Every structure is written in C-alpha cells, then in structure tokens.
C-alpha cells in the first residue's frame, strides 16, 4: 500500500475541517486550528501543539495539516474515525473535564481513547485500503450561510406579501376566465338564436374591478414607500433660496463670535485690574523712596553695606544712609617694603621675626634728632655718624630703590643696535649693554692672578667672600649705638625672657597633666 498523494491529503483535511466542531481547537477553543494530534484524532492550534510536543510522542503525536505532506493512510484513518466531537464526548463520559494538559492526557480516559482510536483506524485501513472516504465517516450537509438582511431592501420592498400578490393576480385570472366561458357558451347557443347582447356590460365591469384592485394596491405601496423615505430624512428641496440660507449661516457665525467675545471680556478685565493694582503698588513704593531722599547711588551703597530696605525684616530702617558721602582717593601711595632687622639672625633668644622689628627705619639725616632736642651739637654730630655706620653695616645704600637710576640704560637708537648686531647669531645682555669688555678684562686679570695656583675654586675666581655664620651677627652690629637703642634692646630681652618663662610654665603644666 503506497502513501497518499498531496492532493488526497488536502482533499481529506478540507472535508474534515469543514465540520463545525473541527473548526476550533480541542483544548483552548481557538479558531482555525492547523495542527492535529494523530493519537487522539483531534485538531489543535499552534500553542496547544507545543504543549502536546512536550508530553512526548508516546502520549501525543503532532503533525501539521498544512505543512506536512508525508502522511500515511493509517494516520489519515485516525483523523477520520476521530474528531473533536467524538473525543470531547468520550472524555465527558469518562469524567475527565480538566483543562490541565498533563493531567488530561495522562488520565485513564485518555489511555482508553488512544486504544480505541488505534483499533478503529487499523480496521478502517484493512477494510477500505486507499479509498478517500469511509462509510462510517458521515459528514453533515453544508448549510448555506445565513444571508444578511439588507436594510434598504426591506424598506423598499412593498408592504404586500408575496401571497397577497399571488392571490391578487389569481383573482383577475379567474375573473377573466369566467366571461370567456360565458362567451363560448353564448357562441355555441348563438348558432340558432343569434348573438346575445345581454352580457356585453359584464366584461367591462370585471375589467374595471380588476384594474381597480391592481391600481389600488400599487398606489398604497407607493404611499408607504414615500413615507419610508421621509422617515430616512431624504427631502426634496423645492423653491429654496440659497442666499437666505447663506445669510442665516453668517448670522449664526456672528452670534457665535459675539458670545466668544463676551466670554473673553471678563478675563481681560481681571488682567487689567491686576495690572492697575501692580502699577499702584509701584507708585506707592516710588513715593516712599522719594520721601526717604535716597538716590540711585545711595541705594546701591546701602544694599552693598547690608542696610537696604529689602533686607530689613521688620520694615524699620535708620537714616544712616542720609549722611553717607563718597570719598575718592586722588593719588594712592604704595606702601614701602619693610626691612626687618633680624633677617640674618639675632642673639640666642630669637629664631624668627618679631613685631618689634617690623617698623621701617627712616634713613634720613635728621631721623634721630627727635631723641633729645635739648642736646648739644656734639651729640647731634655723634648721632649723624651713627646713622652713617648703620647705613654701611646694614647695606641700605646698596639696595636698589625706585629713586636709583639703572647702571646701564638701553640703547635708544634702534638703528645702531641693528647695525651693530645685524649679522650676529646670538646676543647676550652684556654685549647689548656694553658690559662685555669690562667683564673680559676682569676675567683676564683674575686668571693671570691665579695662574700659579694648583687649584681654583669658584669663590677665588669670582672673588666672593663667604658669608659669616648666622651666630656671628649680633644686634649691636646692626643697630646704631644710641642710648634709646640700648634701652630698646634691654626691653626686648626682658620680654623674651618673660616669654620663655611663660613657655616653660605651659610645657611643665602640660607634662604634669597629661604625663611626659
């Protein structure tokens, strides 16, 4: 026995799927199932087919009714003897009404139904062989689809039914047949007696009655038809003036615009009133400012100093701004750099600068004249000599100040510098300012002086003297020898001693309290 062709498979499934119960999924009820379980002979949707695949082929064997073309005759017989209706009735008879897939197809009812489908399919295969249809597979006749009622056809159709029209047509036919019979009888008897004119008016009455019946009913139908059309809202326009309709529409638009304007007017009035109130508040504030006599400049100054009216939480302010005046500095003078006397070190009492040496020393000829105005000329001469010694020892004369002119002024004429150094690749500052010759002469003299020595140091070459140690400097070598300076020195020493004693006391107290 060969396998069925693809056309046979499509034909069989087309007929099986035409059954109403097979048009929905057996498990979930989805429409148009395209998969089938051969083991139970039921149709399934794609989702339920996946759950059947997870059960295993020993419980449910799944195939597609559209994609698979390698069906066997035994599998087709299983689908023909089965069906959704037979399976659902069998499961209900055996009390299996659960929707759980695992519980449903592992139950006793499912096992019995599998065996039943298998036996029926094997019998049908032996009996029918390769026939497409089975005797037991009865398909109910396809009922024509119900026609949808046409709304317009129902309203347009006449009110008189078909039976009424048939009776109306039958009546005139009977009426017409009767005068015909009478005319025949009259004609037969008229061969001897002659024509009879008594019944001449009868056919005319009959025809009049028939015509009246036929005419009345269509007229009634037309009246009813016209009434139906009016109920649908279709009206015939006659003798209408479109200009009047347009004027009415324009008038309606104008009325609508007026209503919109009337609604918007209160909103605009509220906005205008709020603006007026805001302007009034501003005017009141301006009047208050004018009363307080505060100009723009004073307002800024008061805000900067934190005395503005906006910063006053209580609303009370003082009149300090009324007396404010702006002071401009015409020619600001830069402060002179201060020279500390103890830059190079002092006695063993000091290791850092003190506030007693921060005051600048006025290096003038009469700086110490205020010490004793009643002293004689000899004392004044001595003080002037002391100031000169202080200048020499402290090196104030060597310090460059703003009053000192530079040793070498740059060449004013740029043409001379271009002519002089036009072809030179590199220029030093000594060459540009004319210090090269002097430097060369000094270096030659030093080299000639040190030519006989075995070793030369940088200090010997450049004649640099080693700076004295910080401990060699004393306060007496820096400060001028004056009686006030001696007293000042004594006071400083006493203060330093007190500070040292205080520091020692603090240290000992800390050690006693917290331990060494």
Curated annotation (Swiss-Prot):
Q: Report the protein name in the record.
A: ADP-ribosylation factor GTPase-activating protein 3
Membrane topology is: Peripheral membrane protein
Regulation acting on activity, per entry: GAP activity stimulated by phosphatidylinositol 4,5-bisphosphate (PIP2).
| Function, in words | GTPase-activating protein (GAP) for ADP ribosylation factor 1 (ARF1). Hydrolysis of ARF1-bound GTP may lead to dissociation of coatomer from Golgi-derived membranes to allow fusion with target membranes.
User: At the top level of its lineage, which domain of life is listed?
Assistant: Eukaryota
Extent of the signal sequence: none
Sections of the chain in a coiled coil: 243-264
The C4-type zinc finger ranges are: 25-48
Looking up SUPFAM superfamilies in the UniProt record yields:
ArfGap/RecO-like zinc finger
Residues annotated as carrying Phosphoserine in the record are 231, 270, 274, 331, 370, 428, 451, 453, 455, 457-458
Species of origin reads: Pongo abelii (Sumatran orangutan)
Q: Where is this region: Disordered?
A: 170-199, 393-417
Q: Which UniProt keywords apply?
A: Coiled coil, Cytoplasm, ER-Golgi transport, Golgi apparatus, GTPase activation, Membrane, Metal-binding, Phosphoprotein, Protein transport, Transport, Zinc, Zinc-finger
Principal location class: cytoplasm
Organism taxonomic ancestry: Eukaryota, Metazoa, Chordata, Craniata, Vertebrata
Query: What compartments host this protein?
Result: Cytoplasm; Golgi apparatus membrane
GO MF, one term, reads: zinc ion binding
Q: Where are the transmembrane segments?
A: none
């Amino acid at each position: 026995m060969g396998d069925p062709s693809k056309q046979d498979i499509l034909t069989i499934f087309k007929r099986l799927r035409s059954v109403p119960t097979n048009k929905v999924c057996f498990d979930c009820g989805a429409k148009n199932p395209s998969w089938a379980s051969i083991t139970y002979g039921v149709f399934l949707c794609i989702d339920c087919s996946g759950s059947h695949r997870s059960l295993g082929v020993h419980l449910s064997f799944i195939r597609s009714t559209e994609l698979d073309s390698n069906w066997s005759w035994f599998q087709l017989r299983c689908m023909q003897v089965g069906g959704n209706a037979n399976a659902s009735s069998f499961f209900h008879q055996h009390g299996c009404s659960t929707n759980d897939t695992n519980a449903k197809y592992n139950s006793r009812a499912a096992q019995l139904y599998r065996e039943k489908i298998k036996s029926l399919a094997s019998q049908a295969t032996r009996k029918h062989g390769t026939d497409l249809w089975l005797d037991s597979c009865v398909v109910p006749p396809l009922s024509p689809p119900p026609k949808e009622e046409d709304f317009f056809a129902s309203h347009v159709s006449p009110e008189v039914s078909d039976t009424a029209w048939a009776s109306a047509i039958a009546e005139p036919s009977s009426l017409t047949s009767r005068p015909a019979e009478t005319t025949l009888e009259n004609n037969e008897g008229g061969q001897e007696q002659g024509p009879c004119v008594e019944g001449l008016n009868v056919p005319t009455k009959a025809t009049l009655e028939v015509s009246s019946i036929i005419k009345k009913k269509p007229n009634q139908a037309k009246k009813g038809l016209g009434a139906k059309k009016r109920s649908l809202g279709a009206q015939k326009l006659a003798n209408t003036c479109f200009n009047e309709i347009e004027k009415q529409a324009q008038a309606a638009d104008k009325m609508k615009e007026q209503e919109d304007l009337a609604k918007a007017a209160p909103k605009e009035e509220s906005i205008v009133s709020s603006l007026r109130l805001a302007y009034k508040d501003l005017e009141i504030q301006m009047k208050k400012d004018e009363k307080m006599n505060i100009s723009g400049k004073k307002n800024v100054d008061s805000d900067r100093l934190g005395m503005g009216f906006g910063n006053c939480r209580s609303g009370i302010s003082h009149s300090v701004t009324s007396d404010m005046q702006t002071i401009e500095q015409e020619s600001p003078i830069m402060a002179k750099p201060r020279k500390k006397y103890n830059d190079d070190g002092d006695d063993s009492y000091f290791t850092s600068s003190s506030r007693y040496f921060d005051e600048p020393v006025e290096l003038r000829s009469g700086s110490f004249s205020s010490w004793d105005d009643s002293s004689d000329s000899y004392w004044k001469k001595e003080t002037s000599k002391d100031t000169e010694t202080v200048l020499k020892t402290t090196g104030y004369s060597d310090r460059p100040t703003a009053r000192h002119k530079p040793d070498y002024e740059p060449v004013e004429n740029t043409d001379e510098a271009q002519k002089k150094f036009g072809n030179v690749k590199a220029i030093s500052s000594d060459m540009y300012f004319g210090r090269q010759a002097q430097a060369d002469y000094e270096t030659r003299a030093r080299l000639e002086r040190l030519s006989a020595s075995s070793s030369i140091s940088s200090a010997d070459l450049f004649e640099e003297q080693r700076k004295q140690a910080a401990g060699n400097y004393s306060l007496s070598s820096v400060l001028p020898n004056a009686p006030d300076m001696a007293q000042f020195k004594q006071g400083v020493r006493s203060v330093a001693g007190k500070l040292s004693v205080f520091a020692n006391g603090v240290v000992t107290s800390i050690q006693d309290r917290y331990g060494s």
